[in-house]
Design a protein with these regions (language model features):
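Structural preference for solvent-exposed beta-strand-turn elements
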Residues: 1-175
């Protein structure tokens, strides 16, 4: 992993929820989360957009999660409607509160999802939720940037079943 403030913030988030994270001198990251301590990452709000990507994994482990309302970033305002719509189709209920989003799911299942436009964050979030969902999820008009392909390669190496049709911008995930 690269040495950066973004990695440090993400590590802090993972440790907050209960992960044991070790980054070696050769920058290899090893992480285990035997017990999730919390499903809320409110204390780490607005440092980066990673809390949104924690939704799927937290929902699978705890059935509920709470993340902060995320603001913009140096890129500008980035809405989360694509994330919400995709997860809703997979059986997740997301409620907007004053300072947070509260998500709940008891039966996360595969779905046919088509994004209005390719979104890296929404594609990552859908993949991270779909790998442990019941059934098959198809993402049409998915982002296929290198970081998406790297995520898929890592997850497949961990036992996931994800196929990519890069030219067609389609990703199929077998939960």
């Amino acid at each position: 992993v690269p040495l950066s403030a973004e990695i440090d913030i993400t590590r802090e988030l993972c440790e907050h929820i209960g992960s044991d994270v070790v980054i070696s001198d050769t920058r290899v990251c090893r992480m285990q989360t035997p017990h999730v301590r919390t499903s809320s990452v409110m204390e780490l709000s607005r440092k980066n957009r990673i809390p949104m990507l924690a939704l799927g994994p937290l929902l699978h482990r705890r059935g509920f999660a709470e993340i902060p309302v995320l603001g913009g970033c140096p890129i500008g305002h980035r809405p989360i409607n694509l994330h919400v719509e995709a997860l809703n189709k997979m059986g997740v209920r997301i409620e907007r509160r004053e300072h947070s989003y509260y998500a709940q799911a008891h039966d996360i299942h595969g779905a046919d999802i088509e994004f209005e436009y390719p979104s890296v964050g929404a594609t990552e979030n859908t993949i991270l939720t779909a790998v442990r969902a019941r059934g098959v999820t198809r993402i049409a008009n998915a982002a296929t940037e290198p970081e998406i392909i790297n995520l898929i390669t890592m997850l497949n190496g961990m036992g996931a079943h994800i196929a990519v049709k890069e030219q067609a911008r389609e990703i199929n995930i077998e939960g």
